[in-house]
Amino acid sequence: PKFPEFNADKQIVLEDEKIKELIKKTIFACSTDEARPLFTGILVELQDGKITFVGTNTHRLSIKTMEQESSEAMSMIIPSRVLSEIARNLTSELPQEVKLSLLNNQIMVQIDKVVIVSRLIEGKFPDYRRVIPPAFNIKTLFNVKELAGAVERVALFSSDGDYSIIKVSVGNNE
């Protein structure tokens, strides 16, 4: 069957590597709880020559920003399932363009000969900028391998829940 006409109001063209990176760095933080549909998607913002993907389930928050030329500012919430499908279809070794076209409350994604049409998630995404403090009182440096090893050891004692919390105490000159 042929797709219906989709005369887009707005359109964004992204390089495949860029959108893969944006998806990879944010999708894990999305909720899977359909009772709160707003958090099952990724907030996509275009403004000031940058594109930002934001994912949260209210316990985790992930933000990834990259340079992106855009003629106008826009904001939308794309379902995480659509973004997973985009990532799954970006398998070619050759560079590909991903075209996102918006019309009312729908998005059409074109990757080579693949076309995905979906509804956007309606609602107002929480202001994630207010969650992050403008300045931090404590700064610390650590060895990533040592921290990863410590987290793996502590994880053995944590429950299998989604939100295992590790408390880190930092003393003076430690």
Question: Each PLM stretch: what is its role?
Answer:
Residues 1-174:
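Structural preference for solvent-exposed beta-strand-turn elements
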